[in-house]
A protein has these predicted regions:
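Short, solvent-exposed amphipathic alpha-helices that sit
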Residues: 9-12, 39-60, 74, 78, ...
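Non-catalytic structural scaffold of enzyme domains
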Residues: 17-21, 36, 47-57, 103, ...
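Hydrophobic alpha-helical
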Residues: 49, 63-124
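Short beta-strand/turn micro-motifs composed of small residues
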Residues: 27-30, 118-120, 176
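Short beta-strand segments enriched in small/hydrophobic residues
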Residues: 25-37
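Hydrophobic alpha-helical segments within soluble ligand-binding/sensing domains
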Residues: 2-27, 75-76, 125, 140-158
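Hinge/cleft segment of the Venus flytrap/periplasmic-binding protein
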Residues: 37-38, 144-183
Length: 183
């Protein structure tokens, strides 16, 4: 494996979300991937996020919202209903790579006190970050990750040299709209 440590990236996302103040409530947005909500490829990242919150802010309430990635109207309605019932919640996170799915809601319902953290530098996530709807993205430098993975693959195929470690973690980048132009 070549990439970021998913557990640590989740903990870093939680740190960024909570670094400014004492947090009482967090909206954790998850994707509906199957009817029983069992498919969860981002579980290690989410566990890192939740463990950090539990250790650092044990009084914090986590509100989990499920949205369907292919139903933007449903996602908007879910967020609208939640924030109508919980206007005090100012901290949002999504531990998969599709924070852009809530961008329409964030754009149409601005709140200067809201802090939103997402993961991965997909073009649509970067656009949301650039527009100020997302505060931080935790990501990795994909060209470096790709270079290391391809080099290891080539050395294995050509030279017969296996990687020294099973997991080869790369550094994590913290993106904000103020450093986005240089990324």
């Amino acid at each position: 494996y070549y990439g970021v440590d998913p557990y640590k990236s989740g903990a870093l996302g939680a740190f960024l979300l909570t670094t400014r103040c004492e947090v009482q409530d967090i909206a954790l947005i998850r994707l509906i991937r199957d009817r029983k909500h069992k498919a969860d490829p981002n579980a290690p990242r989410r566990h890192g996020f939740l463990d950090y919150i539990e250790e650092t802010f044990p009084q914090c309430r986590i509100h989990t919202l499920f949205i369907h990635p292919e139903q933007p109207d449903q996602a908007y309605a879910t967020l609208e209903r939640f924030f109508r019932e919980h206007p005090e919640v100012k901290h949002l996170a999504m531990t998969n790579s599709r924070i852009f799915l809530i961008d329409d809601y964030l754009r149409r319902n601005p709140d200067p006190e809201r802090i939103v953290v997402g993961f991965d530098d997909l073009d649509r996530n970067l656009a949301s970050l650039s527009n100020g709807h997302i505060e931080y993205l935790v990501t990795r430098h994909i060209p470096l990750q790709s270079f290391q993975a391809l080099t290891a693959f080539a050395e294995c195929v050509i030279k017969g040299t296996k990687p020294q470690r099973r997991n080869n973690y790369v550094h994590m980048d913290i993106l904000h709209r103020r450093n986005l132009d240089n990324y």
